[in-house]
A protein has these predicted regions:
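Membrane-interface motif at the C-terminal end of an N-terminal transmembrane signal
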Residues: 34-53
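N-terminal post-signal-peptidase region of extra-cytosolic proteins
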Residues: 74-76, 106, 158-165
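N-terminal Sec-pathway targeting helices
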Residues: 13-34
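Primarily the HKD phosphodiesterase
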Residues: 89-154
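Solvent-exposed loop/turn segments at secondary-structure junctions
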Residues: 99-102, 129-133, 159-162, 182-183, ...
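Short extracytoplasmic/periplasmic juxtamembrane "stem" segments immediately C-terminal to an N-terminal membrane anchor
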Residues: 54-70
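Glycine-rich, highly charged phosphate/nucleotide-binding loops
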Residues: 72-82, 109
Length: 247
């Protein structure tokens, strides 16, 4: 009968719609999983960049310098050196880091930077955009620091949905420059995982160096400053402005 045919056609159409919805759901789920895997892998694997010839990296260089170098192997000393250098600053502080967290050690650094800004020292911070967005931008103490008139903060290449292919362009630089002369550089981020005596159940083993020359700017300090200036002015950075009305 016509009624039976209509029922059959209706059921067939309903099944087709259901099958279509299932396929669409699987497609969206698959694309989402692929993107998530891509994002996670991008955070782990640095971009493959090779701009120097092998012969350049193996060249022997002889340099005579009056700079002095101090090696820092201990995580407690690493925090104390950062605080000591920040407190000694008279004109300018530059800090670049991949990961900065408002935990115990990170808050100590934030407090020292705030104290320097209160003394009239100009403070510039550049922090990798992914970690800053995940771990730092919502911190009240960091918001207070960023709202200070003498502090500028930039996030390096934060995630942009319109430029997902750049998600693995991360900034792993970790250095602290004081008054354009003395600087600390190494592999430690600014958090309990790398600094201090035990704000976390485990700590990374890493190393820093402090390079100084009695307050006089040297060739290596100038090279680092030039590099910082290039990174600071990149269009991929985003200035972080604290919500001053909350502080």
């Amino acid at each position: 009968s016509n009624s039976g045919k209509n029922d059959l056609l209706g059921e067939l159409e309903s099944n087709m719609k259901k099958t279509f919805r299932i396929k669409c759901f699987k497609l969206v789920l698959g694309v989402s999983l692929c993107f998530l895997i891509y994002l996670l892998v991008s955070l782990i694997i640095p971009p493959l960049i090779g701009t120097h010839e092998k012969s350049d990296t193996q060249a022997e260089v002889s340099i005579t310098t009056s700079e002095r170098v101090c090696l820092i192997d201990n995580n407690e000393d690493a925090l104390l050196w950062r605080l000591r250098l920040i407190r000694s600053a008279q004109e300018e502080i530059i800090l670049s880091t991949f990961d900065f967290r408002a935990d115990s050690s990170g808050t100590d650094v934030i407090a020292a930077l705030w104290g320097a800004a209160e003394r009239g020292v100009q403070v510039r911070l550049i922090i990798d955009g992914i970690n800053a967005q995940l771990h730092l931008s919502g911190s009240d103490v960091f918001q207070a620091l960023a709202a200070h008139d003498n502090v500028e903060v930039k996030f390096y290449n934060p995630i942009r949905l319109t430029q997902l292919w750049t998600v693995n362009y991360r900034c792993h630089d970790k250095y602290l420059i004081i008054d354009r002369s003395t600087y600390l550089m190494g592999g430690r981020n600014t958090s309990d995982l790398f600094l201090g005596s035990g704000g976390t159940s485990r700590q990374n083993i890493d190393r820093d160096i402090v390079v100084y020359n009695g307050g006089f700017t040297t060739a290596s300090a100038n090279t680092l400053l030039e590099y910082f200036d290039r990174i600071w002015l990149l269009d991929t950075n985003r200035a972080f402005h604290a919500e001053a009305e909350n502080h």
